[in-house]
Amino acid sequence: MGVLVDIQNLYYSAKALYGKKVNFQKVLEAAVGERVFIRAIAYGIKTVDGQEEKFFEALEKQGFEVKTKDLQIFPGGVKKGDWDVGIAVDAIKLSKSLDVIVLVSGDGDYIPLVQYIQSTTGCRVEGMAFGESTSAKLGEALDDFIDLSENKKKFLIYSRN
């Protein structure tokens, strides 16, 4: 089984919904459960100041392979940084040799990807995300879905103050 994590999707969902950070270690543990995982990939965006380097290093220590790309800044200041196509390509490649892929994102753009993998490879596609920010149609397309909002204490980092 493989786990593919859209860091930006999860990070911004947790921040917007709860003002908290995600405990990615607990997310990985819940995704894997009792199964043997072959690969866990976290997809992130590097900013100009490189503030996230320590975070990416921590993810690697937790068992993730971290793939990064630079934040694009367009004329006029518009910023763009997403991994949708990269995640889709990796998911299709991996689905040929895995029995389960867990997609950690609530982005409805992944619906065609989920349907394609299910219909062509027989690989199960499961999902994890915060229910309030997850596309309902994505949830329906997945073989199984874990709503991280149902166990916030486990999946969010609360300060000790």
Language-model segments: what does each one mean?
Residues 1-161:
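Terminal and domain-boundary accessory regions
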